[in-house]
Amino acid sequence: MVKEQFRETDVAKKISHICFGMKSPEEMRQQAHIQVVSKNLYSQDNQHAPLLYGVLDHRMGTSEKDRPCETCGKNLADCLGHYGYIDLELPCFHVGYFRAVIGILQMICKTCCHIMLSQEEKKQFLDYLKRPGLTYLQKRGLKKKISDKCRKKNICHHCGAFNGTVKKCGLLKIIHEKYKTNKKVVDPIVSNFLQSFETAIEHNKEVEPLLGRAQENLNPLVVLNLFKRIPAEDVPLLLMNPEAGKPSDLILTRLLVPPLCIRPSVVSDLKSGTNEDDLTMKLTEIIFLNDVIKKHRISGAKTQMIMEDWDFLQLQCALYINSELSGIPLNMAPKKWTRGFVQRLKGKQGRFRGNLSGKRVDFSGRTVISPDPNLRIDEVAVPVHVAKILTFPEKVNKANINFLRKLVQNGPEVHPGANFIQQRHTQMKRFLKYGNREKMAQELKYGDIVERHLIDGDVVLFNRQPSLHKLSIMAHLARVKPHRTFRFNECVCTPYNADFDGDEMNLHLPQTEEAKAEALVLMGTKANLVTPRNGEPLIAAIQDFLTGAYLLTLKDTFFDRAKACQIIASILVGKDEKIKVRLPPPTILKPVTLWTGKQIFSVILRPSDDNPVRANLRTKGKQYCGKGEDLCANDSYVTIQNSELMSGSMDKGTLGSGSKNNIFYILLRDWGQNEAADAMSRLARLAPVYLSNRGFSIGIGDVTPGQGLLKAKYELLNAGYKKCDEYIEALNTGKLQQQPGCTAEETLEALILKELSVIRDHAGSACLRELDKSNSPLTMALCGSKGSFINISQMIACVGQQAISGSRVPDGFENRSLPHFEKHSKLPAAKGFVANSFYSGLTPTEFFFHTMAGREGLVDTAVKTAETGYMQRRLVKSLEDLCSQYDLTVRSSTGDIIQFIYGGDGLDPAAMEGKDEPLEFKRVLDNIKAVFPCPSEPALSKNELILTTESIMKKSEFLCCQDSFLQEIKKFIKGVSEKIKKTRDKYGINDNGTTEPRVLYQLDRITPTQVEKFLETCRDKYMRAQMEPGSAVGALCAQSIGEPGTQMTLKTFHFAGVASMNITLGVPRIKEIINASKAISTPIITAQLDKDDDADYARLVKGRIEKTLLGEISEYIEEVFLPDDCFILVKLSLERIRLLRLEVNAETVRYSICTSKLRVKPGDVAVHGEAVVCVTPRENSKSSMYYVLQFLKEDLPKVVVQGIPEVSRAVIHIDEQSGKEKYKLLVEGDNLRAVMATHGVKGTRTTSNNTYEVEKTLGIEAARTTIINEIQYTMVNHGMSIDRRHVMLLSDLMTYKGEVLGITRFGLAKMKESVLMLASFEKTADHLFDAAYFGQKDSVCGVSECIIMGIPMNIGTGLFKLLHKADRDPNPPKRPLIFDTNEFHIPLVT
């Protein structure tokens, strides 16, 4: 034994890389401790001890608690296990490398074992292989190239032998077709072989037909001998790494027996038998077969028997590795399913995904959740029961020793207490349930560790599955409370997507101080008020809070002093118990002092004068009447000036999540996260208190329609039904005008559907007119807390048309939907129109149709969840290791640049205040004006404003902003200055300040200080919006695209609106885009025209593009038989050609027929006049004249006479913008190139929605833009807004290699290098075996790999390499040492 190099034990060793490879039989023997030879597991005597040299020999480790390992003497927990080996009597193919073996056999000569390349080619490839930076991808590509070259040759350059094709044949069998040849000139080797059988054929005629199928069977022994003879200089050309394994290692001659701890035997006491692992049983079978073959060989059995046993041995070895083999013959198939090695690794429950990438953790709890508005938004109530079990290891120090003593005395049963003590020097843990706790408490020393219960103020992680985005797990502060549920403030429901109908949530207590700090700063609720998807607030008021705040701020809500004080007092809870509150002066003094609800709401924003918060907001509410701003008739224009609500009632837009005009959002952006969180907590207490005191309930009375409403409803229904009858009548008489691109039937459906949905909408608006404003459902719909006007009108007036995949109910019976109606009935009721309301109840047929629509919704949701879940997993896997670096680029873990600057401007999507813009200048300016009134300063004129701005922006602190941002500011200031000039010109105010009255200068007033503050604020906000280096931009992008996907509809409703162009939308469309599918379901090319205001011109171009068949423009095509001749006569319809504006005549038709695939010669087609074409058939060897005539008659109508064959149809789309009609073409089909080249189409303004098509035609940059536009278009269509930076990152990742790679297992394998990452995604075993074959090195650097290896990943905190070196004191204090006297000093001789 070589002495191991000395290492300090506590130094962490980091894995730098992993090499994959194959073990040679010799290495296996060296690694193993024993050779396993016995097929029995236990000795047959009464001891039942594991047999020596058996599969369960205890020298390979131990699987029982009470028996130590016999090799190293350690117990079950410490012994890693030791290997054994089995020698196979005959070699077998390794099922994992079977494809690789065939690959090598195709590349080498089967006679002399050299690779089938000439010397020059060898040299060329070897030079290429010597390149140092050869990536895994290039290696795989090169192998394919060499393989293709070798397979084309069949004469070996080295020995001149003939080689046929090598194929897999049946299960684990390979054949070499040595004597089969397709060439006209037969190779001499083959002819010799055939001649040798001549005499045999003479005597036995049956041999002859079989001779052509002669082939060589390559069994493992033959292959092994071939592989051993491959020359060493040819091995690199097989792309194998000689250090990681030789070709002969691909064939099993020895099997490693894994240690016992991997395959434990379970002892069950019933019949004192044992339960063995699948691997153990397979190994015994293999040993048994080995013995059988050995006996056969010694006794000299028939070759056939040995061959059969060999096949069976081979199958057992294959099942040992991968038990899910396909194609096993029935007589050999295993009776029961077992788990092989591959099964242990693959799949969600396998080693990679189940135990390495994700694992269960300690110190976590899970229980049901319930709401509690008295908690602050960053708190969570933890049951005492949980708090006693979750502990935190706290070190004893000067500050906390008395506190911890008290906890130790309380012990594990009383909360707050402690469960264990670990003393500083001993590694022993002492359990506090037993023993003298008083004594232990007194003996506490500094540096001991006390495992104390969870107490108030601990940082815990709180999570709800499914965790679709990073806000699904956040850090809260714990509050220990009685009862048995987790409770939290309802404002935090949205990010978790939680409701309280029995949801459960998980809680984890981080175990170190660093983890606590990191959790609080990075994952704290307050730090995540906005979503990184687009910077909108997610944590905001919901449901009751909205209703309460809405009712509180209505313009007729007044309170006397007692009531006002009582409501305001509800905010004095918990931390806020001691805050000062200043009651504002009453609004109404006589006859009694009254306060308005708006004043009370202002107290939430700013309770007292000590509070610095002065928020400003002007925005439209939900029911804004459209004119007069703050004089809106519905009081729905919200104005907040310096934290006082001046006008408007609060609703979802100003308090709820998902809008940037939210008051909490303003507080967050201008005053910081703590102020926003405090205001939200105050609202969460005050609104429910007010609401429950005022009373707010909903009952059947709220949805009872009045007489007037019923009458209005019947009138509406009658009018609508009458109109539908008219349409049906028009269809029957043939007077219905068709919509472009639709048949008459489709047009009718579209018209009726439109008409019936109008009925419901009108009934709904009639409802709203009738209902009293105190009606509860109406109030909820108005303030946006729950429900919509459609829900109300369905309850009160009419449920409306039931749509199934976007159209009316289809026919389930013969020509009718249900047997209650007449056949071919097109009436509204027969096709799923529900005229009743939920209040009046549905008739049986209506109910049936209603359940049909409901069923569709349910199925849709269930399917959608699985689809989007898988899509999100793929997105995360491919984007996870992208990270913004210190040089502002975005790179993957291997250092490939994906973007030169994140999103084109390096800004963080979460910090955007406008739509995709970092700032909304107008709001910032209004805010500055309100907070800094500067009463004594003069107002600036237009020119002064521009000059002041430019002088401030020349200062050095503005150098850090990008030029484009500074341009934006200048543009905005210019707009403001123009407005000032307009106002001053209108009122005749001069710029030198002498106009009377002086008050005119207050109009659009802006002062120098305000300009300066404005520019400073802009600069600060811009710098704050920069993306931090180290941010995991990829993961954020994946979540921001995947998470809205779950809220989209899955099925695509083909709406018959847009000139009936059906575009796929929703999840299937997103899936198509990110899969980079070559053939998408609805390819559409949008073509702008050279003249876009002329309808006739549009029709002309449409004719040039749309595929027109001969059958569509001919009056008749008929066969003509003359006595001596027969031909087909085609009569063109000149009228139809003229109407369709086609550029077709008899001559062009003749040309089209000749160039089509009908095999008609130009001499056979004659043109008579302008409208008649005759085609004469020709007899050929295969068929007679009559049949040729019939074929022609069949195929002539399908000849394309004009247009692009791939285009099925084109529709003229009319854009009515600014009063003018603009025409463009929507072309269905793929052939962008041909459409762009069509005369009359503006080629530069033609786009397609098929990424592949665009890449083929216009290149990779155009494809990237297409991906961006298509994803954005799909999202916007579903009302989702995603910051464009996310979409840009995704499209850059898909296109940065120079081709469009889909986010699928194929695209991922082309993007990523790392074996571990690919193995943890899909096809685990294939990737691992491939890596071993190539001898691949994995330099653990990506996210997946780091998690699997358990080392910190280089993203975020792991990104930087330099640490700050603290300043040291140059002369540190010296301690006097014992021997520090001069006589002990040795003089230094220099």
UniProtKB/Swiss-Prot annotation:
GO BP: any one term: DNA-templated transcription
> What EC identifiers does the entry list?
2.7.7.6
Binding positions (Mg(2+) 1): 499, 501, 503
Q: Where is this region: Trigger loop?
A: 1029-1070
| SMART domains according to UniProt | RPOLA_N
Q: Does the keyword DNA-binding apply?
A: no
Q: Where is this region: Bridging helix?
A: 843-884
Q: Name one GO cellular component term.
A: nucleoplasm
Quick one: which residues bind DNA nontemplate strand?
Answer: 144, 167, 1159
Record has Acetylation as a keyword: yes
Q: What is the top-level taxon of the source organism?
A: Eukaryota
Tissue expression as described in the entry = Expressed in the brain, in the cortex and the white matter (at protein level).
The residues listed in the UniProt record as binding Zn(2+) 1, with positions renumbered to this chain, are 69, 72, 79, 82
Chain sites annotated for binding DNA template strand: 326, 348, 353, 360, 366, 1305, 1323
What is the purpose of this protein?
Catalytic core component of RNA polymerase III (Pol III), a DNA-dependent RNA polymerase which synthesizes small non-coding RNAs using the four ribonucleoside triphosphates as substrates. Synthesizes 5S rRNA, snRNAs, tRNAs and miRNAs from at least 500 distinct genomic loci. Pol III-mediated transcription cycle proceeds through transcription initiation, transcription elongation and transcription termination stages. During transcription initiation, Pol III is recruited to DNA promoters type I, II or III with the help of general transcription factors and other specific initiation factors.
Could you give the subunit structure recorded for this chain?
Component of the RNA polymerase III (Pol III) (Pol III) complex consisting of 17 subunits: a ten-subunit catalytic core composed of POLR3A/RPC1, POLR3B/RPC2, POLR1C/RPAC1, POLR1D/RPAC2, POLR3K/RPC10, POLR2E/RPABC1, POLR2F/RPABC2, POLR2H/RPABC3, POLR2K/RPABC4 and POLR2L/RPABC5; a mobile stalk composed of two subunits POLR3H/RPC8 and CRCP/RPC9, protruding from the core and functioning primarily in transcription initiation; and additional subunits homologous to general transcription factors of the RNA polymerase II machinery, POLR3C/RPC3-POLR3F/RPC6-POLR3G/RPC7 heterotrimer required for transcription initiation and POLR3D/RPC4-POLR3E/RPC5 heterodimer involved in both transcription initiation and termination.
The record's listing under NCBIfam families reads: PRK08566.1 (NF006336)
Protein name according to UniProt? DNA-directed RNA polymerase III subunit RPC1
The gene name on file is POLR3A
